[in-house]
Amino acid sequence: MRRTYHTILKERFHRRLWYERIRLDWTQAEMAEQLHMDERSYSDLDTGKSCCSAVTLVLFLVYVCEDVALFLEELRNAFEAGTENAA
């Protein structure tokens, strides 16, 4: 079950991260700077190759995400749908 949560978070975070970067018209380097990470690590997040750390998630929610409540609601809904399918 924990793997399901990790997979869902990875996919949802990747999508929202990309969306917010495009919305803000930022390069990967600019987004990496906002999230206090190197460009290579950011690129892995932006392409969905890796999942975010707790610190990166918090920095994203505090400094980048336009609608935190909406993102968290979408994430909760995805978790609920994903765990129902896994059961």
Regions found by a protein language model. Give the residues of each.
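A short, Lys/Arg-rich alpha-helix, primarily the initiator
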Residues: 1-23
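Short, charged recognition helix plus adjacent turn
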Residues: 2, 7, 70-87
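Residues that mark the N-terminal boundary/hinge immediately upstream of a DNA-recognition element
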Residues: 16, 27, 53-56
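Residues in the recognition helix of alpha-helical DNA-binding motifs
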Residues: 20, 34-35, 45, 74
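Short alpha-helical DNA-recognition segment
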Residues: 25-44
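DNA major-groove recognition helix of helix-turn-helix/homeodomain DNA-binding modules
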Residues: 53-71
